[in-house]
Amino acid sequence: MLLEQLRRAAEQRHALALTRRRRVAHTACAPHQAVGEDGSEPESLLTFCSNDYMGLANHPDVIAALVEGAQRYGAGSGASHLVSGHSLAHTQLEAELARWLAPHIPHACTLYFCTGYMANMAVLTALGTAGATLFCESLNHASLIDGARLARADVQRYPHCDTAALEALLAASTSERKLIVTDSVFSMDGNVAPLRKLLELAERHDAWIIVDDAHGFGVLGEQGHGVLEALGLSSERLIYIGTLGKAAGVAGAFVAAHETIIEHLVNTARPYIYTTAAPPAVAHALLASLAIIEGEEGTQRRAQLTRCIGMLREGLAQLAAIAGWTLGDSETAIQPLIVGDNGAALALSATLEADGIRVGAIRPPTVPEGTARLRITLSAAHTEDDVRRLLDALSAAVAQREVA
């Protein structure tokens, strides 16, 4: 019975062009990567779908630090943080991250997690207790949505970036604990949440803000310290979540907040307590990554990324006008080219791959019905020639469609 039900579900997904499949990377994460199917010979593809925004996943200094960390601390941690798995490398990483966030969160401490999903689940379930209310942005990442579902708090959603609607909800709430929950950079659209206004509302209505800066940490801000640095925000009411497997190029995530909140998470957050700590070598490698992000090389890499974003947007705007597509309103490394139909998005992705370029087609339920898209992501490791090649391939696809 179970297998038959699952087969029918698979058939329905296939009919709606919603089937997902894994590809196999045979080489390191980089703009040019050897990619294949299970059991097939790989082909070299120019890739515009990773979240390695700073191009650090294959950086020699980060790799060397990972090797050094493994030699010093071993391959694994052996236990959870609260048993015997918390190492000097974890402590040093948390201290460095706290230094980064200290100008924006008074009395800041940080807590390192194995994944961003776990960090989001931990914060929402530990703070979203009975009697609390979570005011959730409608386009939040799935991990924030799942965390809200598991929390015992009341959950209220407000429309995308609609601060007036949020203020009405806050004003009407009698909750003893109000928590505004939002992405900073929205993962499928690339636009930035109105955090300055959200902070004003939090202060006015005695609320706190949980900000998931997964796609901003390491990229935004003069030193790459993230969206809070970029916007010049500072408040005790900020609970900040940063991802370390995207721009930082390695793995994991962290929560930065007032020391009292971090102490509460250490003692109550089940995704932190009941799992084996990440390998110390990963934390050691992240220290090298943070040094690059904050230093002169990081500044140069962010400048290169900015150049590529501007070049890509200029070309995509022209193509979208011809093809009837919609280019999302994004100034970040995430550039959504909205095609609309699921099949059309898959076909365009396949056309590009036949030309040696890999761009993922994003479909419901990840995005709303009728907004299937190519999610084009840029890296500081991309060159202007890489961007030009993508634009030329898209232009050829548009011309081919016009002829057909």
Curated annotation (Swiss-Prot):
The reactions it catalyses are: 6-carboxyhexanoyl-[ACP] + L-alanine + H(+) = (8S)-8-amino-7-oxononanoate + holo-[ACP] + CO2
Pfam families (UniProt xref): Aminotran_1_2
Q: What's an example GO BP annotation here?
A: biotin biosynthetic process
Q: Which cofactor does it need?
A: pyridoxal 5'-phosphate
Keywords noted in UniProt: Biotin biosynthesis, Pyridoxal phosphate, Transferase
Per the record, residues carrying N6-(pyridoxal phosphate)lysine are: K246
Name the SUPFAM superfamilies on file.
PLP-dependent transferases (SSF53383)
The protein's Enzyme Commission number: 2.3.1.47
Q: Which GO terms describe its molecular function?
A: 8-amino-7-oxononanoate synthase activity; pyridoxal phosphate binding
Protein residues bound to pyridoxal 5'-phosphate: G116, Y117, S187, H215, T243
Chain sites annotated for binding substrate: R20, H141, T366
Q: Which domain of life is it from?
A: Bacteria
Q: State the pathway, as annotated in the record.
A: Cofactor biosynthesis; biotin biosynthesis
The record's note on quaternary structure and interaction partners says: Homodimer.
The protein's matches in HAMAP family, at most eight in alphabetical order, are given as: BioF_aminotrans_2 (MF_01693)
Q: What does this protein do?
A: Catalyzes the decarboxylative condensation of pimeloyl-[acyl-carrier protein] and L-alanine to produce 8-amino-7-oxononanoate (AON), [acyl-carrier protein], and carbon dioxide.
Protein family (similarity comment): Belongs to the class-II pyridoxal-phosphate-dependent aminotransferase family. BioF subfamily.
- Protein name, UniProt field: 8-amino-7-oxononanoate synthase
| Natural source organism | Cupriavidus necator (strain ATCC 17699 / DSM 428 / KCTC 22496 / NCIMB 10442 / H16 / Stanier 337) (Ralstonia eutropha)
